[in-house]
Regions:
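AAA+/SF3 P-loop NTPase mechanochemical coupling elements
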Residues: 63-66, 83-92, 122-142, 153-154, ...
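A short beta-strand-to-loop transition that corresponds to the Sensor-1 phosphate-sensing loop
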Residues: 98-100, 125-126, 139-144, 161-162, ...
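Phosphate-binding P-loop
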Residues: 1-6, 14-15, 87-90
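Walker A/P-loop
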Residues: 9-52
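Conserved AAA+ ATPase core "coupling" helix
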Residues: 40-42, 148-189
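Substrate-gripping "pore-loop 1 plus following alpha2 helix"
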Residues: 81, 109-131, 150-168
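Conserved RecA-like P-loop NTPase ATPase core
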Residues: 38, 75, 90, 98, ...
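Conserved AAA+/SF3 P-loop NTPase catalytic/coupling segment centered on the Walker-B
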Residues: 67-68, 83-116, 148-151, 171-175, ...
C-alpha cells in the first residue's frame, strides 16, 4: 500500500523483524521512472558528480540510506559551492533512515519542510539554489533503546522513562508527515 500510493512509512519492531530487508526491497517494486523523472534523476546525480552506471539504473528509482552520523551538508546539500545532498539524490525514489531515533533531532526536524514542499532551498555565500526532493521516506526503529519491548522471546531492559525519552527523539510534526506506521513483530524462524 505504501509503495503503490507513494506514502511515507515507518516500521517499528525488534532487531531481526525484517524492517531493513523490507526497506531495501521497496525500490525494486516501485514502478519504473518515467523518462521525465529519469532525466530529473540524472540531472541531480550529475550535479553531485555521480554517475548512474548500468542499464538497470533506468529501471529503478534511486534508493539512499544515509548513516545517522551524516553531516547537515551531506543530508540536505550545500557546501562552498551548493550541491545536492541525500534528500535530493533520493528524488523520485526512496530515502531510508534506519534506526531513526539515532539521528540528531535537529537533523530530523530539517526534513519536515522538504517532505511537505518536495524541494529544499540552500543558501550559501556562493549563491542560492532550490533542488527537488520529492521522495518516499521509509524509516525503521526499535520500539525501545534495547529493542525488545513487546518481543515474546526477549525481555525488555528499559525503564519507562528511557522508552519515553527514546521515542521523544522523533517529534510529533515529523511523525505527522509519515503516513503509515507499522509494527513489525519479531519473526520466529
Amino acid at each position: 500500500v505504501a509503495v503503490a500510493g507513494g506514502h511515507n512509512l515507518i516500521m517499528i519492531g525488534p532487531p531481526g523483524s525484517g524492517k531493513s530487508m523490507i526497506a531495501k526491497r521497496i525500490p525494486g517494486i516501485m514502478p519504473s521512472p518515467t523518462l521525465e523523472e529519469f532525466l530529473d534523476i540524472l540531472r541531480i546525480h550529475s550535479a553531485a558528480g555521480q554517475t548512474m552506471n548500468g542499464g538497470l539504473r533506468f529501471l529503478q528509482r534511486p534508493a539512499r540510506a544515509p548513516h545517522h552520523t551524516i553531516s547537515d551538508v551531506g543530508r540536505l546539500g550545500g557546501g562552498t559551492i551548493p550541491g545536492p545532498g541525500e534528500i535530493s539524490l533520493a528524488h523520485h525514489g526512496v530515502l531510508f533512515l534506519d534506526e531513526l531515533p539515532e539521528f540528531k533531532r535537529s537533523a530530523l526536524e530539517v526534513l519536515r519542510q522538504p517532505l511537505e514542499d518536495g524541494h529544499v532551498s540552500i543558501s550559501r555565500s556562493a549563491g542560492k539554489i532550490t533542488l527537488p526532493c520529492h521522495f518516499m521516506l521509509v524509516a525503521a526503529m526499535n520500539p525501545c533503546p534495547c529493542g525488545y519491548l513487546g518481543d515474546p522471546k526477549h525481555e525488555c531492559r528499559c525503564a519507562p522513562a528511557q522508552i519515553q525519552r527514546y521515542r521523544a527523539r522523533i517529534s510529533g510534526p515529523l511523525l505527522d508527515r509519515i503516513d503509515l506506521h507499522i509494527e513489525a513483530p519479531a519473526l520466529s524462524i
